[in-house]
């Protein structure tokens, strides 16, 4: 009997080390940044069983077999659609400003589609304005509405949006609503999905969270886009979820969420429409390619409109394109660079680019919320402050709520707004969308918003920051080490 126990123990020990060796090899063979690989290996070696399970759940980009197959199947038709769109030459910009030229070239080469001109654009800086505008535009819809959000939380003006959507669906407007399963969990537990479906709205739960399938698909891969498309002509996107801040996360202790949304009219809606169609087909298998814009009847403002490039990121889209876009934007700065983000956990490349810009004499501002809804990300963000401050970056901690706006403004001319946080999940994992606007008028609008944020912020003084308690530095370094995993 003793011999049997000994054999069993040796077999278990051998299996244990074989499992660790196998996962280690798997980590090393995947193409990833060295800091990320080292962080995963540290977790696996310190807490082997917990580390292995965590890695299998969250360590690899896995869309799931069915979605991955759909993602591959949709590209031939999508590529043909993009080629057909290029035939509408009047909607594509042929010139860009000096600061924007490299970024637009990058996006065109990586995505196959250039910047679109002739768009009218309005920056909505309050959730009330954005929600009321949505209610109005949805009520005017004639043909179709496509909506995708990470979070849909009932309450306040959001309920008016829901009622408007159901009303137009009842009169025959084709309405599609796709919401992330994790972000909109409260919505899917509410009566609204049944009410909307009864009204004729096609409601889809994206990337369904299921404990039975945790090892078959990465559970923290989320549908993080925020888009509303109306009649293939009106479009919205930005940092705002479908929530009324007066009713959203009031017990989090961070104040109301502060966001921006962009309302657009013009061919940019077509570019956003193909992104939605890809997401919809990946999730449902249904192909819904948007119609090409009719340049003969749509009132595109060729002379006064904005030039916009749409960047889509996530599984099935050009890998790393948003990361490249941010790097290109930062290195293009010559006078001023202003960035706002709720979560500041940049890659090494982005960190060095920001520091280099400041050391070249560019006036660099980063605006982050003083109080964050994620303790882990809050500590990890502070771990980068010392290096940024030493390089000459001005860091502002916003005190008027949870600043959720994601924006970049380069030299007052080149603007980036959308859903992308400066963290690893947004940069490399989630389905995201970013608008690139080459226009000094829009840049002036965004600058006014950012200046208001700065006025409501506290500037971090390097000397004061250097005197923070030693225990805080220890906690910061701990989270800094694991920042590639956040």
Swiss-Prot record:
Q: What is its main location?
A: membrane
Does the UniProt entry include the keyword S-adenosyl-L-methionine? no
Subcellular location(s): the record lists: Cell inner membrane
Q: Which UniProt keywords apply?
A: Cell inner membrane, Cell membrane, Lipid biosynthesis, Lipid metabolism, Membrane, Phospholipid biosynthesis, Phospholipid metabolism, Repeat, Transferase, Transmembrane, Transmembrane helix
What domain of life does the UniProt record list for this protein's source? Bacteria
Q: Please provide an example of a Pfam family that matches this protein in its UniProt record.
A: PLDc_2
Which residues does the UniProt record annotate as the domain PLD phosphodiesterase? 219-246, 399-426
Please state what class of enzyme this protein is.
transferase
**Entry's EC annotation:** 2.7.8.-
Q: May I have one GO cellular component term?
A: plasma membrane
Q: How does it sit in the membrane?
A: Multi-pass membrane protein
- Keyword Ubl conjugation carried by entry: no
Transmembrane region(s): 3-23, 38-58
Q: Which InterPro entries match?
A: Cardiolipin_synthase, CL_synthase_A, CLS_N, PLD-like_dom, PLipase_D/transphosphatidylase
What are the recorded GO MF terms, alphabetically? Answer: cardiolipin synthase activity
Name a biological process GO annotation.
Answer: cardiolipin biosynthetic process
Catalytic activity, reaction form = 2 a 1,2-diacyl-sn-glycero-3-phospho-(1'-sn-glycerol) = a cardiolipin + glycerol
Q: What residues make up the catalytic site?
A: 224, 226, 231, 404, 406, 411
Q: Which family does it belong to?
A: Belongs to the phospholipase D family. Cardiolipin synthase subfamily. ClsA sub-subfamily.
Query: What the protein does?
Result: Catalyzes the reversible phosphatidyl group transfer from one phosphatidylglycerol molecule to another to form cardiolipin (CL) (diphosphatidylglycerol) and glycerol.
Official protein name in the record: Cardiolipin synthase A
């Amino acid at each position: 009997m003793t011999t049997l126990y000994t054999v069993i123990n040796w077999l278990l020990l051998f299996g244990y080390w074989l499992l660790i060796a196998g996962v280690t090899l798997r980590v090393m063979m995947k193409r990833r940044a060295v800091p990320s690989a080292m962080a995963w290996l540290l977790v696996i070696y310190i807490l082997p069983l917990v580390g292995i399970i965590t890695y299998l759940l969250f360590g690899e980009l896995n869309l799931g077999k069915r979605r991955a197959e759909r993602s591959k199947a949709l590209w031939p038709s999508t590529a043909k659609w993009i080629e057909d769109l290029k035939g509408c030459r009047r909607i594509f910009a042929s010139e860009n400003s000096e600061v924007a030229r490299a970024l637009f070239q990058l996006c065109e080469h990586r995505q196959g589609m250039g910047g679109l001109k002739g768009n009218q654009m309005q920056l909505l800086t309050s959730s009330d304005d954005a929600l009321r505008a949505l209610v109005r535009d949805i009520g005017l819809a004639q043909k179709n509405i496509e909506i995708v959000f990470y979070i849909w939380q009932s309450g306040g003006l959001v309920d008016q949006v829901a009622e408007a959507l159901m009303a137009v669906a009842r009169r025959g407007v084709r309405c599609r609503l796709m919401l992330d399963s994790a972000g909109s969990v409260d919505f899917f537990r509410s009566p609204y999905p049944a009410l909307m479906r009864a009204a004729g709205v096609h409601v889809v739960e994206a990337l369904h969270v299921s404990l039975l399938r945790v090892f078959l698909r990465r559970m923290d891969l989320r549908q993080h886009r925020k888009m509303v498309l109306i009649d293939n002509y009106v479009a919205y996107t930005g940092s705002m979820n479908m929530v009324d801040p007066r009713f959203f996360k009031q017990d989090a202790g961070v104040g109301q969420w502060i966001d921006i949304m962009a309302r657009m009219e013009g061919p940019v809606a077509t570019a956003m429409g193909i992104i939605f169609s890809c997401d919809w087909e990946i999730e449902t298998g249904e192909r819904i390619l948007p119609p090409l814009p009719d340049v003969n009847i749509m009132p595109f403002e060729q002379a006064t409109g904005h030039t916009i490039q749409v960047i889509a990121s996530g599984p099935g889209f050009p890998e790393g394109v948003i990361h490249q876009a941010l790097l290109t934007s930062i290195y293009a700065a010559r006078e001023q660079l202003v960035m706002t983000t709720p979560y500041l956990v940049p890659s090494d490349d982005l960190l060095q680019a920001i520091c280099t810009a400041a050391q070249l004499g560019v006036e660099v501002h980063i605006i982050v919320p003083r109080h964050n809804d994620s303790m882990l990300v809050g500590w990890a963000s502070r771990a980068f402050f010392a290096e940024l401050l030493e390089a000459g970056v001005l860091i502002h901690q916003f005190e008027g709520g949870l600043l959720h706006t994601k924006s970049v403004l380069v030299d007052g001319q080149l603007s980036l707004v959308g859903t992308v946080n400066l963290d690893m999940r947004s940069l490399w994992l989630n389905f995201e969308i970013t608008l690139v606007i080459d226009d000094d008028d829009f840049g002036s609008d965004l600058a006014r918003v950012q200046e208001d944020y700065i006025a409501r912020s506290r500037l971090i003084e390097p000397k004061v920051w250097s005197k923070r308690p030693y225990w805080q530095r220890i906690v910061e370094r701990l989270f800094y080490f694991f920042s590639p995993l956040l």
